[in-house]
């Protein structure tokens, strides 16, 4: 993880998580594993099947657990309304590694 000084202005907290996401698709985490200061880091992202994935720390039933999620879904859930409850996140430019909010939209799979 890369340490940084502060969250970007457009970063928002991920629902049910202690982590944050910005409009560029970066995931941020405060690390206090050693009980000292809470250092801020950009979380590492891995690539699988052409998509970026990231471990996010979620609170489930009062307990914290790291869950691997697609970065595009994290960004879209945080910034793009989905009133029709569409199931998938699509990349407008077909580049699955480009998770900027302006490149994402909710959609469905064609039959």
Briefly describe each language-model feature range.
Residues 1-88, 95-111:
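Conserved recognition-core residues within compact binding domains
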């Amino acid at each position: 993880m890369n340490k940084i000084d502060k969250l970007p202005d457009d970063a928002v907290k991920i629902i049910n998580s202690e982590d944050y996401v910005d409009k560029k698709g970066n995931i941020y985490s405060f690390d206090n594993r050693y009980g000292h200061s809470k250092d801020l880091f950009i979380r590492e992202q891995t690539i699988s099947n052409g998509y970026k994935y990231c471990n996010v720390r979620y609170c489930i039933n009062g307990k914290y657990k790291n869950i691997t999620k697609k970065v595009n879904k994290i960004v879209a859930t945080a910034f793009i309304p989905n009133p029709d409850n569409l199931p998938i996140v699509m990349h407008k430019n077909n580049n699955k590694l480009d998770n900027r909010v302006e490149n994402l939209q909710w959609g469905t799979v064609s039959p």
